[in-house]
Amino acid sequence: MFIDKGASPLPIREAKMQKTAYYENSGLFGGYTYAKPESYSYGPSQQQYPQSSLDNDYPSTACSVQPAAIRAPNHKTNDISNSCMRTTSSQNSNQTPSISNQQHQAPSLPPSSPSHSNTSAQKKSKSSNSSGSSQSTMNKQIFPWMKESRQNSKQKNSSSTPPAGENCEEKSPTGPSSKRVRTAYTSAQLVELEKEFHFNRYLCRPRRVEMANLLNLTERQIKIWFQNRRMKYKKDQKAKGIMHSPTGQSPDRSPPLSGPNLVGYSSQLPTVNSLSYDAPSPTSFAKSQQNMYGLAAYTAPLSSCLPQQKRYPGAEYEHHTMQGNSGFANPNLQGSPVYVGGNFVDSMPASGPMFNVGHLSHPSSASVDYSCAAQIPGNHHHGPCDPHPTYTDLSSHHTTQGRMQEAPKLTHL
């Protein structure tokens, strides 16, 4: 009982102290709020409440909220310094929706709103500055070196630009992997180069320098063009030679010669007694026989014993009598024709005399038929492996009495 009696006056005193504190501070809030309305702008929708209605209608709520309202400015200034104004203002507005709470928050919001706007502006400016700085750093990291490389390439191209009228592009300096751009020549330059190539396939350096100055080209470009043009000329010549050759071979190739059957081609001379070109023969060839042959005669390897030879002057032909194992005719191939004295004759049997040209022994014969189409047997074939080379591509030639026809011209020599 004593505890109850002693404890009863304490809440009354606390209530009186809170009321007096409220009425003492109400003037402060009233002057802070209503006496100086021009110091803080609230907008056109700001409502002012009379003090009497607050005192009569909401005494207890105002007393209960008063200490928090008194502490609010200091607390919120600390929050402003810590950049936490937005969260505290939103919490206070959500937790105390009453009119008195709005009134007590009114003096606290005015200093906070400009500071909050300032902080938001500062945050925006900082974010914009940070974004601008990040963009600038990104620009510095990516774009400037590319722009510098382009400027450098432009400067290099401008410094290395050739004179007017030249359509050649220099080597691009963008990277080591870039290839040299193909040089484009104008029609006038090509005409001059082709004209010069027609007269001189190889240019000396003074002429090359002169043409470089004349055509606005470099000396190196002219040199490379002439190298390429010479290679093209060689290819064209080879293609023409293959097309014009009858056998499809290149003209610089001659029929193959093998073994002891080496053929001596006679030179195309008008006289009969002139010396003919004899191919190198084996060691068994007799030296005394070299000058005994007329025009277009084949030299044949002989054996150790030489038969007697009969030499005819002028347009007459000599008769050869040889043994069966020496000569072009092989006993196994008796049907192969042999070219002797400008004519094709069929080989005789191995036991009898060979190369006996019967229809040429008389000078009074009207004409001699050189055509070989009727004298070639069916079993004869041409090829590089044929040990008895014969020539069937000769056209028909005719000779009269006392005059000898020249040997057929060989175009591939």
From Swiss-Prot:
- Which InterPro entries does this chain map to? DUF4074 (IPR025281), HD (IPR001356), HD_metazoa (IPR020479), Homeobox_Antennapedia_CS (IPR001827), Homeobox_CS (IPR017970), Homeodomain-like_sf (IPR009057)
Q: One Pfam family of this protein, by short name?
A: Homeodomain
Residues annotated as transmembrane: none
Q: Where is the composition biased (Polar residues)?
A: 54-64, 392-403
The short sequence motif called Antp-type hexapeptide sits at 142-147
Q: What is its main location?
A: nucleus
Chain segments carrying region Disordered: 36-181, 236-265, 381-413
Role summary: Sequence-specific transcription factor which is part of a developmental regulatory system that provides cells with specific positional identities on the anterior-posterior axis.
Q: Which GO terms describe its biological process?
A: anterior/posterior pattern specification; embryonic skeletal system morphogenesis; regulation of transcription by RNA polymerase II
Provide one Gene Ontology cellular component.
nucleus
By sequence similarity, the record places it as follows: Belongs to the Antp homeobox family.
Which residues lie in Low complexity bias regions? 37-53, 87-107, 114-141
This protein's source sits in the domain of life called: Eukaryota
| Name this protein carries in UniProt | Homeobox protein Hox-D3
A molecular function (GO) term: RNA polymerase II cis-regulatory region sequence-specific DNA binding
Q: Which organism is it from?
A: Xenopus laevis
Keywords attached to this entry: Developmental protein, DNA-binding, Homeobox, Nucleus, Transcription, Transcription regulation
Note whether tRNA-binding occurs among the keywords: no
The protein's location, in the record's own words, is:
Nucleus
Per the record, DNA-binding region residues lie at 178-237
Entry-linked Gene3D superfamilies: Homeodomain-like
